[in-house]
């Protein structure tokens, strides 16, 4: 029996290593790998990219674009984990749960662009509310997120974990202070916002896991929209989703904190709606593993859909 061949271009980076670990013991796919001395050889990479059934690109943006250019075999399908193609109209956005029928779009796609980690949480919260008309498209969205330092890739991991670091890393590093984070166009486009959201990301002094929050002022929403309606919309949208759950309102009301590491090691996304009707304020939250649903887990979920596993969504 012939099994689909998967080539991970960039399998030594943070995301590539995680995807390889998720696939190496599976018996339904065959991993095509290059010897260490050939991993950066353009000719050998091109050979592998054209010999596989599905190529998974775990590369910097420029290298990912180059890799796509190497592909001449029309049968090769691609999952790109970089941000190079996330707003390109000829690539299918790899968030199966974001819209009805979207898992099938991924299943039949030739080119799939894996979502960014922060956009996964932001789009997961915003898109259903915008589609339902509960949140105006021109709402001034503000997004705050803290990720484990692995979200910064190998350089950040080395900086936080190196015993030889001259200066100990800060417990919290707010970054993107120029307000030009590369995830902003992706969030705006796939959430369906009319304007750029205000996005403030940070790295915490822990390895992995994200907590992302979006404050909502009910007075700026259409008349009659309440926190309960926002929650009901999200709960209905994700009712059949295998990897997305919405915390019941009563559980959210009883919560005292959000743990960014709560879903580490999973491919799950947990959404929450915290309501203070008396103040007219709501806090939307998303908790997930930046290396799971925010990266490698999402890539493998998309791979499974492309291989015909409808249960992946």
From Swiss-Prot:
Reaction catalysis annotation: N-acetyl-L-glutamate 5-semialdehyde + phosphate + NADP(+) = N-acetyl-L-glutamyl 5-phosphate + NADPH + H(+)
Enzyme Commission identifier(s): 1.2.1.38
One annotated GO molecular function: NAD binding
Statement: the UniProt record of this protein carries the keyword Lipid metabolism: no
Biological or metabolic pathway of the protein: Amino-acid biosynthesis; L-arginine biosynthesis; N(2)-acetyl-L-ornithine from L-glutamate: step 3/4
UniProt-listed Gene3D superfamilies: Dihydrodipicolinate Reductase, domain 2 (3.30.360.10), NAD(P)-binding Rossmann-like Domain (3.40.50.720)
Cross-referenced SMART domains: Semialdhyde_dh (SM00859)
Top-rank taxon, per record: Bacteria
GO cellular component terms given for this protein: cytoplasm
Protein localization: Cytoplasm
Gene Ontology biological process terms from the UniProt entry: L-arginine biosynthetic process
Classification via InterPro entries: AGPR_type-2 (IPR010136), NAD(P)-bd_dom_sf (IPR036291), NAGSA_dehydrogenase (IPR050085), Semialdehyde_DH_NAD-bd (IPR000534)
Keywords (A to Z) from UniProt: Amino-acid biosynthesis, Arginine biosynthesis, Cytoplasm, NADP, Oxidoreductase
SUPFAM superfamilies associated with the record: Glyceraldehyde-3-phosphate dehydrogenase-like, C-terminal domain, NAD(P)-binding Rossmann-fold domains
Coiled coil spans: none
Active site per database record: 117
Similarity remark: Belongs to the NAGSA dehydrogenase family. Type 2 subfamily.
Stated role: Catalyzes the NADPH-dependent reduction of N-acetyl-5-glutamyl phosphate to yield N-acetyl-L-glutamate 5-semialdehyde.
Name of this chain's protein: N-acetyl-gamma-glutamyl-phosphate reductase
Species of the source: Burkholderia cenocepacia (strain ATCC BAA-245 / DSM 16553 / LMG 16656 / NCTC 13227 / J2315 / CF5610)
